[in-house]
Amino acid sequence: MIEVLSRCNAIIDEKKLEERLVALEAAKSWSPRVVSRLEMLLRSGTDEALYRINPIQFATEKSIAEAESIDLFLHACVAGLFDMDWQLVCPMCSDVVESFRSLRKLHTHFHCHLCQSDYDAALDDYITVTFTVSPAVRSIRFHKPDALSAWDYVFYYKLTPGGVLPDGVPWSDAAKGLVRVLTRMEPGSAANLEVDAAEGALLGQDFDSDAHFFVPVASGTGVTPSHVPVMLDGGKCVTARANIAPGKVVFEVRNAGKLPVVFGILQLPMATFQRPKLHFTPSLSGKRLLMTQTFRDCFRSEVIGATEGIAVLDVTLVFTDLKGSTALYERIGDLNAYIQVQRHFQHLLDA
């Protein structure tokens, strides 16, 4: 194996990259410079740029037709350049609640720990598809989420930049300004987390479970305790009741559970803080991917039974009568007739 250091200080397997780019070039007839633009991204893109790539955004940035961009990443997956992920994204906070390598592993119901909310997934709502560089071609730090810093884990691994506030700022960027403390805690460990509390409220959050505390902060509430004990244990958070006034306070946090946690304390502007409604930048929905012929050709095992138990919100019903279908089966055989019927429906889908 030949390894080279790229300009962005990334280790690339040059032999595999070249072989797989050749396979991608041969997959179909591409528009000029489409594959070279992808190669440039693979060689010189940052770790963030190669993680959960949105092919619709890539198309816009590189002046490529959306359909060709989707085909590009699908064929790149077949060639082994990228891995494809199906993600359940919370509509309230843009948290990637769950991520799957296969559509078959998706389920209909999901729970967002950050919002304490439950949702039902649909292929055209909450389910998006992204692409991440294969670790066999180039290693990026997001391939090992357990080794990420607490900051990277929350703001790049957990939250997607696709959720945008009414003023156009990504929610993940706005949320960074609320964080006062953010740390990883191993099982059995303890940490004294000091916060300079302001009017509003303090939210303590384990980013992988429902464990949290919510403490209003207001003037005239009495003496603020210098230390507030907090215990995290198996998805639960136990903390002493405290009257918090503006000023410095130390939270004595102990992870009594058996798993590591990423724990943070956020300063909310008011005790009744309501997160603004998000809208999402265009992305590749599960429904659109399933309607893409390249996906149906290259990932046939994913298509079979793909929509079992998964809703589609926007549906058009078409009633079609196949005249003489029984005679067709008898004349040319079951398999050939089945293929003809499938082509009939494919023509309808493509219309």
Model-identified regions with their sequence ranges:
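Noncatalytic accessory or regulatory domains flanking protease catalytic cores in secreted, cell-surface
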Residues: 191, 225-248, 254
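N-terminal alpha-helical interaction blocks
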Residues: 2-81
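Noncatalytic modules at the cell exterior or secretory-pathway interfaces
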Residues: 196-206, 242-261
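Long, charge-rich boundary regions
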Residues: 120-211
